[in-house]
Amino acid sequence: MNDDNQQSAHDVDASGSLVSDTHHRRLSGAQKLIVGGVVLALSLSLIWLGGREKKENGDAPPSTMIATNTKPFHPAPIDVTLDPPAAQEAVQPTAPPPARSEPERHEPRPEETPIFAYTSGDQGTSKRVQQGETDRRREGNGEDSPLPKVEVSAENDLSIRMKPTELQPTRATLLPHPDFMVTEGTIIPCILQTAIDTSLAGYVKCVLPWDVRGTTNNVVLLDRGTTVVGEIQRGLQQGDARVFVLWDRAETPDHAMISLASPSADELGRSGLPGTVDNHFWQRFSGAMLLSVVQGAFQAASTYAGSSGGGTSFNSVQNNGEQTADTALKATINIPPTLKKNQGDTVSIFVARDLDFSGIYQLRMAGRAARGRDRRP
C-alpha cells in the first residue's frame, strides 16, 4: 500500500501542460517589472525612429517632375538676310526711307530644339529626326534642289582593257625618186675583206658581190665591187656569242660615196655577227688550279708534320698559299671572251634608213627613142 501511494504521488500527468501549471503561471513582482521595462523601451525606440525618418523627408528639397515633350518636332527658323538692291541712278532726290527696326531674334523654344533619338526598336522615329536635320541643313545653305548624287566609279580591269590605244593617223606619201632610192629594211650581202678579232676595238671592211638596185629594180645604184667600211666599238662580255658591227659608209667603183650608219647582220638578217668564241678557260683558271694543287700538297705535308710535332712552319706556308691562290684567281677571272671570224665569210648590212642617190644620178633616154627625139625639128 505504501508503495502504491508513493507511486501515485510521484506520477506525472502526461496529458497535462507545463504552462498551465499553477506553479509556472505565477510571476514574481520583480519579473513583472523587468518585462514591463523591456516593452516600454522597445515602444520608445520605435516611436523615435519613425519621427527621425519624417524629419529627414521634410528637410529634402521637393522633387520636380519633368514634363514629357509630346508635341511634334519643328525645326528652328533661320533668319535669311536679303541682298541689298542694286543702286539705281537717282532722277530726283527723295527722302531716305525710314530706318528698319531690327527684327527680334527668335529664341527657340524647348519644343523647337532638335532632338536626337537613339532607339533600337523605333526606327521610324529615328529616320524622321534625321530627315528633319537634313532639311534644316539644306534650308540653311539655301538649297532647294535635292542633294547631288555621288557617282561611283565603275572602272575595273575589263573596262580598262576594252579601251583601244589611240594613235595619231599618218599620211601616205610617194617616194620622190623611187628609181634612185634604197629603202629602209633592205638587206645587202657583203663579203669580209678583213678578219675579225674582238680583243680590241677597230675597223672592218667588206665588198659587195652583186649589184644593188633601186626600189623599181631598174637602176643600179651600188655596183658590184663597192667597198663598205664598218667599226667594232667594243669587245664581247661574259655570255656574249655575237659581235656588233656598225657599217659607216659605202664607196662605189665610180667613187660615189654615201653614209650608211646601219647595223650588221648574218645571212638570215639576225642582229650581230656570229663566230668562233674563245672563253680563255685555261688562262682564267689554270693559275688557280695549279695553286690549289700546290696548296693540297702543303696541307698533306702539314698533316704529316703535325703528327710528328713540327707543323707550325707548314701551317704558315699553307695560309700563304691560300692567299696567293685567291689573288691569282681574282686577276684572271675577268678576262673577257674573244670572237674570231675569218676573212671571206659572208655577212649582211641591214639598211636602217632610206638611201637617196638622186643627187648624183640622172636618167636619160637611150636607143631608138633617143635618136628619134633628136631628129625632130
From Swiss-Prot:
This is Protein virB10. Residues 53-152 are annotated as: Disordered. It holds the Pfam family TrbI. VirB proteins are suggested to act at the bacterial surface and there play an important role in directing T-DNA transfer to plant cells. Residues 120-132 have a biased composition (Polar residues). It is found in: Cell inner membrane. InterPro entries: T4SS_VirB10/PtlG, T4SS_VirB10/TraB/TrbI, T4SS_VirB10/TrbI. It comes from Agrobacterium fabrum (strain C58 / ATCC 33970). The lineage of its organism: Bacteria, Pseudomonadati, Pseudomonadota, Alphaproteobacteria, Hyphomicrobiales. Keywords: Cell inner membrane, Cell membrane, Crown gall tumor, Membrane, Plasmid, Transmembrane, Transmembrane helix. Its main location: membrane. It is a single-pass membrane protein. GO terms for biological process: protein secretion by the type IV secretion system. The chain crosses the membrane at residues 33-50. Belongs to the TrbI/VirB10 family. One of its GO terms (cellular component) is plasma membrane. Residues 101-112 have a biased composition (Basic and acidic residues). One of its GO terms (molecular function) is identical protein binding.
